[in-house]
Amino acid sequence: MDNHVVLTMRGISMTFPGVKALDNVDFTLRKGEIHALMGENGAGKSTLIKCLTGINAFEAGEIHVEGIEGPVVNHSTLDAQKKGISTVYQEVNLCPNLSVAENLFIGREPKTRLGTIDWKTMVKKSEAIMADLDMKIDVTRNLEEYSLALQQMIAIARAVDMDCKVLILDEPTSS
């Protein structure tokens, strides 16, 4: 196992009115490791994930991500993605009325020399992404035409393709 640290959370604390949701939480993730957060409802699992992904602002502590100078404190979800943190949630967080290819590349569409979306390249790259996961589907079809389980796999494919350092799966197989 590689000993290279990609993520460190130190002293993360967060309080909701009347409830200490996180109390001085420390967490270290090394390259290649797989972790599972387990606990009862209300134990703080989702809150910790939301702090890491920029959804919740934590009150105390620091988050360090490999290759980023200094601590990452109360960053946004976009900052988290730019720093290599990808998340797939239990609820599919994609656009059902867009094609699979559009969903895979939303916000990072390949462009032509003229600055317009390069649809041919997007479709070709989308087919390659899905083929890498042994999924032979028509990427030009709208996401809503596929089962919820397949939509979840497409969300996972998108997260993996974003060249992430940390991939968080928040109950992604529940559907």
What is each model feature region?
Residues 1-175:
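Glycine-rich phosphate-binding loops of nucleotide-dependent enzymes
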